[in-house]
Every structure is written in structure tokens, then in C-alpha cells.
Amino acid sequence: MAEQEGPDKPPLNEQPVAPSASQDDATVETAEEAVEPPEADINELCRDMFSKMALYLTGELTTTSEDYKLLENMNKLTSLKYMEMKDIAGNISRNLKDLNKKYASLQPYLEQINQIEEQVASLENAAYKLDAYSKRLEAKFKKLEKR
């Protein structure tokens, strides 16, 4: 049973024919023309890209430089504040040492005041006892006088 070869079907032993070289070149040329702009446009686009990239990088570097300058100024101000705080702490320390010296020089007088206070309390206690004794004596005297 042999198959019939028809106008639609190629014979079984024949392979399909590839397009000719002239057909292939026409297709490639069309693709290249559609994708690739003229060389003058490419050069202009490259210059434009490089100038914009240069502007961008210059801006980035300027921003970074300004950030570092800001940090430097902040560090200087912080350093000045710490110097002021150091001076204030030094003044407080000196004043505290002076107060401690004055307190040490007043210490004997404070001890004398404490001793005098104790003596006054003792004398006051003795005066109350003497007052109580004198009242008892007076009461005895009045009692004896009534007899």
C-alpha cells in the first residue's frame, strides 16, 4: 500500500528546503535597522548619559561631603559642651573642697556647741530637781508652821 503523493504533501524521501541566503539576509537587515539607531544619535545619547551620570555622582559626593562637614561641626560643638561641663565640674569640685576645709575648721567649735548643749540640758535638769526640792521644802515648812 503505497501512499499517494499529493500537491500538498512533499514526497517522503525529500526534505523541506531551507530559505535561501538572500531571504535570510533581508530578514536580518530589517531587524538591524529597526533596533540600531544611527551612530550620531548613539554618540549624543552617550554624551547625555555621561553628563547626567556626572551630575548625579557630583551631587552624591557633595551630599556626602556636606554630611561629613555637618558631623564634624556636631563633634566640635559636642566637644565644646563637654569642655564647659568639665570646667563646671572642676569648679564644683574646688568649691566642695573649700566647703570641706571650712567644715573641718569649724568642727572643734561644733563639738564645743554640742558639749555646751549637753551641759545646758544637765543644768536644766538640775534646776528642775532643785525647784521640785524647794517646793517640797516649802510644803514641809508650811505644814510645820500650821502646827
UniProtKB/Swiss-Prot annotation:
Gene Ontology CC terms, in alphabetical order: axon cytoplasm; BORC complex; centrosome; lysosomal membrane
Compartment(s): Cytoplasm, Cytoskeleton, Microtubule organizing center, Centrosome; Lysosome membrane
Biased composition (Acidic residues): 26-41
Keywords from the UniProt entry: Coiled coil, Cytoplasm, Cytoskeleton, Lysosome, Membrane
Ranges where the record places region Disordered: 1-41
Principal cellular location given in the protein's record: cytoplasm
GO process annotations (BP): anterograde axonal transport; anterograde synaptic vesicle transport; lysosome localization; neuron projection development
Coiled coil: 84-132
Keyword Membrane in annotation: yes
Subunit details: Component of the biogenesis of lysosome-related organelles complex 1 (BLOC-1).
The family this protein is said to belong to: Belongs to the BLOC1S2 family.
Function: Component of the BLOC-1 complex, a complex that is required for normal biogenesis of lysosome-related organelles (LRO), such as platelet dense granules and melanosomes. May also play a role in intracellular vesicle trafficking. As part of a BORC-like complex may play a role in lysosomes movement and localization at the cell periphery. Associated with the cytosolic face of lysosomes, this complex may couple lysosomes to microtubule plus-end-directed kinesin motor.
Protein name: Biogenesis of lysosome-related organelles complex 1 subunit 2
Organism: Xenopus tropicalis
